Amino acid sequence: LLTKNQFALLSYIAVRPADEPALSQRAIAQGTGKALGTVNGLVKQLDAMGYLDGANRITDAGRAALAPYRVDNAVIMAAGMSSRFAPLSYEKPKALLKVKGEVLIEREIRQLQAAGIDDITIVVGYMKEKLFYLEDRFHVKIVINEDYHRYNNPSTLMLVRDRLKNTFICSSDNYFEQNPFELYVYQAYYASLYSTGKTDEYCMVTNRKGRITGVQVGGSDAWYMIGHAYFDRSFSEKFTQLLEREYDSPVTRAGLWEDLYARHIRELEMYIRKYPGGIHEFDSLDELRAFDSAYVTNTDSYIFDNICAVLHCTPDSIHGIIPIKTGLTNLSFKFSCGGRDYVYRHPGAGTEAYIDRPAEARAMEAAKALGLDDTFIYIDAARGWKISHYIEDAAILDYHNDEQVDTALRMLRRLHTSGVQLDGRFDIWEKINGFLDRLQGTDVSDFTGMQELHETMCALHARLKGDVVPLCACHCDSYNPNFLIDKQGKMYLIDWEYAGMADPGCDIGTFIACSDYTTEEAEQVIARYLGHAPTGAELRHYLGYVAMASYFWFLWGLYQEACAKHVGEYLYIWYKYAKQYAQLALERYDQEEAFA
């Protein structure tokens, strides 16, 4: 094996074009950054080993000695959505952003190829079809990661683990001012920059030789991971074994590959590669604007065009963009413009299958007129994007705060008795059957008890259908996160995607179905909504709609899971309430029929 200094000198000579004149020792010293005396000694060693020919040219034996250090390939990770880079990442993969006149991933590919690395694999996922052109244009290989939306980047490396050898691991959204790639690399490393002051990045601790001995998230005045990494064959072999062994663990799938490395840092030998600067990861549009002034006035974004048209502003006045993680179906972000804060709602993929956007637009206009949602500014009835005022430090309704619950119930009552005619109809049974149709052929609805649950709900539907309850304007998604309270205590009922003419039981049923109420508390809520003690017919009807709403949202949740969107604990709550309240309601229907 070569020493590090021998490798540095030999690899420097090896990558020079063969038709160029031989280098002097002084030129080698300048090119490698080593002292002239050191170079003189190294040249003598390499001459004696037969790796140089006496005229500072590499021999065949020298190339053979370098062969174990030659880079085999590169993997570019381009599967993720980069949600922090809203809103541009809503429209195309971040890899396709044009920075300083060049598409990020194209620049990276060209830099790899300029270094002599032609075996390049790109792992795609989010908006994958927009990246397929790279295969023909640059002769790269494409691998599709179908798990990009539910697992982190270990899922990408798992797909290409058989390709991990002497391999550069790259992110598709890095911008390197200078080409960092080399045809020969001595050992595994991670690129790093120095942070003066605090940083939230992965910070490294190293020993005297530069081996990484510790990694922690966040630090101060520290070298942190950024940009590319390099796996040598030894690292790749050990890392692949660990990845295969631990991949099924939720900790591994949810974390980054760097987290797996950090847990096994003693087994995995990797060194720090320090750079003075010139490596960029743009985590927000504001960061990109600071680097490329073209984005101040021209974002090449239809979302920005939408905002400018509604707020009568220019792109450079839109700033402070922060993704909002609440909500299971849509993508939203907060932004500032003209001294005020707003929210832009971008319709989630697939929502057009079950949401009537024109009906939502009419409902939002009605809600504003009724004083139920003063946040609303504009909605595009055809495409579903929406702009609203942002409520600073908003709180959501507390199901166990009597004053808040009474306010929410009064708002629902105001809507139900308003006489407003909405364009759409929310037939909950029709919606239930729609989700059942969509779930056909999926695994998520194939479980013990599902058929029995559906038969129970069919029986309940037959009873509810016999109740004579006039349809009225309903919100149909009236659970506590949609009741926002500002700092002055004013409540807003937001998100009218499901609104339509419906049985008022849809709203009360949903309100209770998403709570942790006992059945006694649920009955009290029904009475508070009605403003009087419910009759037997009223109580059974509203209890039945708690079950029906729970079943609807349970199926909705299964559909989200089938689309790889994690619903969480609500799924169990809805399943439990569907069974529990269906039994209660059916018992009351049976009792009254027996009495009659």
Model-predicted segments: where are they?
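An alpha-helical support segment within catalytic cores of ATP-dependent transferases
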Residues: Y302-H319, V420-C476, K487-Q488
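ATP-binding pocket architecture of kinase catalytic cores
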Residues: I322-W429, L436-E452
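Conserved beta-loop-beta/alpha segment of the NTase-like Rossmann-fold superfamily
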Residues: E129-Y202, T206
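N-terminal glycine-rich phosphate-binding loop and ensuing alpha1 helix
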Residues: A65-K128
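Conserved alpha/beta core of the MobA/IspD/sugar-nucleotide pyrophosphorylase nucleotidyltransferase superfamily
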Residues: R63-A74, Y224-V310
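Conserved core of the sugar-phosphate nucleotidyltransferase
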Residues: E177-T252
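ATP/Mg2+ or Mg2+-diphosphate-binding catalytic cores
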Residues: D292, V296-D300, W556-A596
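Active-site activation/catalytic loop segments of kinase-like enzymes and analogous catalytic loops
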Residues: G505-P534, A547-K565, L584
